[in-house]
Amino acid sequence: SGDTSSQAKGMWFGPRL
């Protein structure tokens, strides 16, 4: 529950940071 959320966060925060 929350796999897509975790993936989206990493993709959005990954390149951002």
From Swiss-Prot:
PROSITE patterns given in the database record: PYROKININ
Modified residues (Leucine amide): L17
One GO location term (cellular component): extracellular region
Entry superkingdom: Eukaryota
One Gene Ontology biological process: neuropeptide signaling pathway
Tissue occurrence: Expressed in abdominal perisympathetic organs and abdominal ganglia.
UniProt GO molecular function: neuropeptide hormone activity
Keywords, ordered alphabetically: Amidation, Neuropeptide, Secreted
Predominant place of localization: secreted
Localization of this protein: Secreted
Family to which the UniProt record says this protein belongs: Belongs to the pyrokinin family.
Function: Myoactive.
Name by which UniProt lists this protein: Pyrokinin-5
